[in-house]
């Protein structure tokens, strides 16, 4: 299969995506499979994707073992680059079931469980339990309906008929129950990645635009100076995550730890009295620019496809943009007091040198 991928495509990629609307909705988990090829290889690519999906083999135990080891090694190598993202996911995981599920699928808990699976396989010298789990997941995937996105030239679609089997069935899976643990992960890093998360809102909530603008104001108006310029971290900021309905603070490659969490708290207090019109205008411009950023024709089409999967219409996207533009300082102060004064959860990735200091955070 790898030889065929190299012959006809630029590779086949697969990833899971969790789509949510409100905290009361069940959410949806999608497996996204993508590839690209020349027009002349369009049919071969399509057939290869279907074959790879439907005819996956689980009898090559050594190959599965190797792939799991490669998967773990790549994720461990990415800790220094993505430590702030992993810390934010960990901090948010206690706030709601969506965050907890995302953490299990792509966070440090996923890496921890993968390493535990390898350790167990080595101990019992048997991969059958893992293979059984993979086969169960595979059977759920291939029995679910799927949607097709294709971006190509008109010529490639001439006389083309898609022959995808669409089995109308549902595979329901419960979301992960969040825990109340404050987690610190000890790594080989010489620095810290600090994160603090608060319960936020979904994209459809009227407060979502103000929270997005507030995140940018906090980053540019306070966190950059306090944590990067004065504290020596490589970066710091805040993020309004409408996928997991959380609001997050983070620092990146940070030589300090407890001082950073103090800075997060000070940033919240600063937002209640010190936001200027310039802060507001710059933040609105930044958020609108991210909404309006130009994409390639394929990128635009993919963007529309993903929004359609989430049942977000063009009208809703334009309304969201307008609500961002209409944000006032009073709106930012209101959402800061409403959401960022509640209970939060903290998480840290840090080296051994920080181990004792973590107990007091």
Language model features with spans:
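M16 family metallopeptidases and their MPP-like homologs
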Residues: 1-55, 61-124, 143-152, 194-210, ...
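Aromatic-residue-lined binding/catalytic grooves and analogous aromatic/hydrophobic interfacial grooves
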Residues: 124-128, 135-137
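Extended beta-strand-rich architecture
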Residues: 153-186, 197, 203, 216
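Short, low-order "capping/linker" segments at domain edges
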Residues: 182-191, 293
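Conserved small/polar residues in nucleotide/adenosyl-binding loops
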Residues: 359-361
């Amino acid at each position: 299969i790898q030889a065929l991928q190299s012959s006809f495509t630029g590779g086949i990629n697969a990833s899971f995506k969790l789509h949510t609307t409100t905290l009361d909705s069940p959410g949806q988990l999608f497996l996204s499979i993508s590839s690209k090829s020349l027009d002349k290889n369009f049919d071969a690519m399509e057939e290869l994707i279907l074959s790879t999906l439907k005819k996956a083999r689980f009898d090559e135990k050594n190959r599965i073992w190797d792939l799991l080891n490669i998967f773990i090694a790549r994720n461990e190598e990415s800790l220094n680059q993505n430590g702030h993202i992993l810390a934010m996911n960990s901090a948010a995981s206690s706030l709601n079931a969506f965050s907890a599920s995302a953490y299990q699928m792509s966070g440090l808990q996923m890496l921890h469980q993968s390493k535990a699976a390898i350790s167990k396989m080595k101990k019992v010298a048997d991969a059958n339990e893992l293979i059984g789990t993979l086969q169960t997941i595979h059977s759920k995937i291939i029995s679910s309906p799927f949607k097709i996105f294709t971006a190509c030239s008109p010529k490639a679609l001439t006389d083309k008929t898609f022959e995808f089997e669409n089995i109308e069935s549902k595979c329901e899976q419960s979301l992960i129950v969040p825990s109340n643990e404050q987690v610190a992960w000890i790594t080989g890093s010489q620095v810290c990645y600090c994160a603090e998360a608060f319960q936020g809102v979904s994209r459809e909530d009227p407060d979502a635009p103000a929270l997005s603008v507030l995140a940018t104001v906090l980053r540019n108006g306070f966190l950059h100076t306090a944590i990067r310029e004065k504290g020596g971290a490589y970066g710091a900021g805040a993020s309004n995550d409408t996928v997991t309905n959380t609001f997050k603070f983070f620092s990146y490659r940070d030589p300090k730890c407890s001082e950073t969490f103090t800075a997060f708290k000070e940033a919240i207090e600063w937002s209640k009295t010190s936001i200027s019109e310039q802060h507001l205008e710059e933040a609105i411009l930044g958020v609108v620019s991210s909404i309006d950023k130009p994409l390639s024709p394929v990128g635009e089409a993919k963007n529309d496809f993903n929004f359609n999967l989430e049942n977000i219409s063009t009208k809703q996207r334009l309304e969201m943009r307008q609500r961002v533009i209409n944000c006032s300082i009073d709106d930012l102060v209101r959402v800061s007091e409403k959401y960022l004064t509640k209970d939060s959860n903290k998480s840290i990735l840090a080296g051994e040198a920080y181990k004792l200091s973590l107990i007091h955070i």
